[in-house]
Amino acid sequence: MDSNTITSFQVDCYLWHIRKLLSMRDMCDAPFDDRLRRDQKALKGRGSTLGLDLRVATMEGKKIVEDILKSETDENLKIAIASSPAPRYITDMSIEEISREWYMLMPRQKITGGLMVKMDQAIMDKRITLKANFSVLFDQLETLVSLRAFTDDGAIVAEISPIPSMPGHSTEDVKNAIGILIGGLEWNDNSIRASENIQRFAWGIRDENGGPPLPPKQKRYMARRVESEV
């Protein structure tokens, strides 16, 4: 196993521990807590894949970080901060919406690009709105935390979420996953509308009618993919 992979995991574990302490002391906001829960799942998945104990890795990570801080100067820190662009966090969903349990009568799911797409194929003739929480860098979606599909009465009927044990995903991965989800829901005559944030940061355009900015050709292609999988 590559030593850099182990070191990276150990440091990530310790930094997660520090962030958890902040959360326990009520020193962080809702987006911070969102990322904390997501990263906890990711660390558990990585630990299982690498065969490493999280507690031991956290202690080793602490030693590595402490050694680095001993040689770190304020000037180096200022330079690092100035040269690194800071991502923004976009929230369509509240904490309640993103953490609510939901169930499917006719479950269908697909893995694509490190993302899990889930949808209830029993849903028909509904108006559905897509909402998502994600980070943005350089005015483009960087990392998806969660995307969920809601009916007008607030019921959750579909979801896209990162798979903790798999490597990260790209903007194209997210767009493809959304296309699969839309195709599957529209196959049952549902009407889909994406939030303005999804339209702006995933595709960089806005549809005047509030619909998902997918060309008809791409919608039909995604629908055929879902039909073949179902």
Curated annotation (Swiss-Prot):
Coiled coil: none annotated. One of its GO terms (biological process) is symbiont-mediated suppression of host PKR/eIFalpha signaling. Disulfide bonds: none annotated. The keyword Ubl conjugation applies. Residues 1-73 are annotated as: RNA-binding and homodimerization. SUPFAM superfamilies: Ns1 effector domain-like, S15/NS1 RNA-binding domain. Residues 223-230 are annotated as: PABPN1-binding. A motif (Nuclear localization signal) lies at residues 34-38. This is Non-structural protein 1. It comes from Influenza A virus (strain A/Duck/Alberta/60/1976 H12N5).
